[in-house]
């Protein structure tokens, strides 16, 4: 069980009359052999160890990570999930969006301010690496925590699906024309605390804050702490009014902070709690459901841990019904509406993809932020960004994002750079938004929301964070299928945006443009002839051991064949691809 222990070099600086630390971490990203569920496989670790270490900071601290890529055969990078990166958009870590990936043998420094408290996590946002292990908790503590004094200690509880094969093989097997059911890789099991200790020490008469994170690539999880209630105090790093519930559903990417207590009646007992993988239509359920795990709330270290927790029916609390602690009212009036219709699709090679508005995200040659920073006033024109499904809003705009889920399954969607208000999220089968629904006057805020099958969700933000931010499904396999769009926020304030020279040099070293439109054209930024529009027919990535010769060939997005239209040919009324690199 992770504890709130800070392992770093801390330098004190005075900020606005208070003391803040600079948390400096030196990380070497390496392959490590691990067996969290008893099956040995290569995983991506830090400084020769796995699980990857937690990061602990306090509001106002500066977090600095000096990262060296020693994988030998794969580019990498770090994204800090839930951190809004105000004024540091280039640190968001999404490959070819905010920066270029970091090649083997080279280094990159990430630096950002821990400006908002909460439970976050970091992970690779490059080539589906985080299911291979590159992920860890990021906790920002609050000296002014409104729940201070209501708990005695805290622990971290991570949950994840787990695969015995490496990501490269899984994605290669998924992106084939014979996969006509759009079947994602199915996990071989689940792990809690990355295969570590699942027990939570809970002394009689005390309350523990449990920080729950779902690191999964595909599945949501159900959680119940035995016969006792849990009090939710935070959702996705947003304080909420204390809500007493019995069961919780945690989607991929989501986090919950809950309080769990032990009373005198628990003396001498070790109380079982149950985590179960959410039943999903992609699974063939056998007679015995094996994807669950029992942990214990330990009130007596000498007492046996033999009792089992049985749940007859999962009925979790609705994640869209929490009330923000500050009771911030619904944003409005609206300035813009961004409607995204999500559905399954296929590309011109009959390979299964996923589409917003009949289009799939295609990674471009120039990082999208670099385009916004270098094309002048043209950065307000969506056409200069290529096939990244761009949507542009001005500073101060109130934006409503409407996502119509045309698929019968539940999908978790995540927005970088913001905590959005969940205006409305109807039950499954409600159909697409018809404009007639009412809004929650005091909506909860979070950065991942599960959208029910055959239904929709409405989300609102104020454009107060200039930058380039992805909006995507947080099922990692669906990101690889292309279920991503791009928010270009306040481009009028991004012209000439100052990007660290080290990041520019990293792009140049790989042959990527650092200025101009999506193709790197600085002369005629409206010339789309060099844009990438085709989904690659092969997927290249990493697999251990490192091939002979050390570093793999430099991977580059595929060029559009000469004379081909800038729009991908549609099959089944769909098109496109996402961020798969090919070797040429």
From Swiss-Prot:
Localization annotation: Secreted; Cell surface
Pfam families xrefs: Cu-oxidase, Cu-oxidase_2, Cu-oxidase_3
Primary localization: secreted
Any one GO biological process: cellular response to iron ion starvation
Signal peptide annotation: 1-20
Single Gene Ontology MF annotation: ferroxidase activity
Cellular component GO terms held in the UniProt record: cell surface; extracellular region; high-affinity iron permease complex
Phenotype caused by lack of the gene: Does not affect the production of scytalone.
EC top class, as a word: oxidoreductase
Protein name: Multicopper oxidase PfmaD
Lineage: Eukaryota, Fungi, Dikarya, Ascomycota, Pezizomycotina
Gene this protein is translated from: PfmaD
């Amino acid at each position: 069980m992770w504890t709130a222990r800070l392992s770093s070099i801390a330098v004190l600086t005075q900020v606005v009359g208070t003391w803040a630390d600079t948390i400096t971490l030196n990380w070497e990203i390496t392959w490590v052999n691990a067996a969290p569920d008893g099956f040995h496989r290569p995983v991506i670790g830090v400084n020769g160890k796995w699980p990857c270490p937690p990061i602990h900071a306090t509001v106002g601290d500066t977090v600095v990570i000096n990262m060296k890529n020693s994988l030998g055969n794969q580019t990498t990078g770090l994204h800090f999930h839930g951190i809004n990166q105000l004024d540091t958009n280039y640190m968001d870590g999404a490959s070819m969006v905010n920066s270029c990936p970091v090649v083997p043998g080279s280094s990159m420094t990430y630096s950002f301010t821990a400006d908002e408290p909460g439970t976050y996590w970091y992970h690779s946002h490059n080539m589906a690496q985080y299911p291979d292990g590159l992920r860890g908790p990021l906790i920002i503590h609050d000296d002014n925590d409104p729940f201070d004094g209501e708990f005695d200690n805290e622990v971290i509880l991570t949950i994840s699906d787990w695969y015995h094969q490496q990501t490269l093989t899984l994605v290669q097997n998924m992106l084939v024309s014979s996969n006509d059911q759009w079947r994602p890789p199915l996990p071989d099991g689940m792990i809690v605390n990355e295969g570590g200790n699942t027990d939570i020490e809970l002394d009689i008469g005390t309350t523990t804050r449990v920080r729950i994170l779902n690191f999964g690539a595909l599945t949501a999880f159900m959680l119940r702490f035995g016969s006792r209630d849990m009090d939710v105090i935070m959702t996705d790093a947003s304080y909420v009014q204390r809500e007493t519930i019995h069961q919780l559903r945690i989607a991929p990417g989501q986090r919950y902070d809950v309080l769990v207590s032990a009373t005198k009646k628990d003396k001498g007992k070790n109380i079982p709690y149950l985590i179960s993988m959410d039943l999903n239509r992609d699974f063939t359920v056998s007679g015995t459901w094996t994807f669950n795990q029992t942990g214990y709330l330990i009130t007596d270290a000498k007492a046996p841990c033999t009792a089992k927790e049985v749940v007859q029916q999962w009925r979790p609390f609705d994640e869209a019904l929490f009330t923000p602690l500050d009771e911030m009212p619904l944003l409005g009036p609206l300035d813009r509406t961004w409607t995204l219709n999500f559905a399954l699709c296929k590309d011109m090679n009959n390979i299964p993809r996923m589409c917003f508005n009949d289009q799939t995200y295609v990674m471009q040659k120039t990082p999208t932020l670099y385009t916004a920073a270098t094309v002048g006033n043209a950065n307000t024109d969506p056409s200069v960004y290529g096939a990244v499904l761009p949507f542009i809003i001005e500073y101060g705009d109130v934006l409503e994002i409407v996502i119509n889920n045309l698929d019968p399954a539940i999908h978790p969607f995540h927005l970088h750079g913001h905590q959005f208000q969940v205006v409305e999220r109807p039950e499954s089968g409600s159909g697409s938004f018809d404009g007639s629904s009412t809004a929650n006057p005091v909506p909860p805020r979070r950065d991942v929301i599960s959208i029910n099958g055959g239904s929709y969700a409405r989300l609102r933000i104020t454009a107060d964070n200039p930058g380039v931010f992805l909006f995507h499904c947080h099922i990692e396999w669906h990101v690889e299928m292309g279920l991503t769009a791009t928010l270009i926020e306040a481009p009028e304030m991004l012209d000439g945006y100052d990007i660290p020279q080290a990041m520019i040099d990293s792009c140049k070293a790989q042959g990527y443009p650092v200025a101009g439109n999506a193709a790197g054209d600085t002369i005629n930024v409206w010339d789309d002839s060099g844009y990438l529009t085709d989904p690659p027919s092969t997927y290249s990535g990493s697999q251990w051991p490192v091939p002979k010769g050390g570093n793999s060939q430099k991977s580059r997005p595929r060029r559009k064949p000469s004379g081909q239209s800038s729009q991908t040919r549609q099959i089944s009324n769909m098109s496109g691809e996402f961020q798969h690199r090919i070797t040429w």
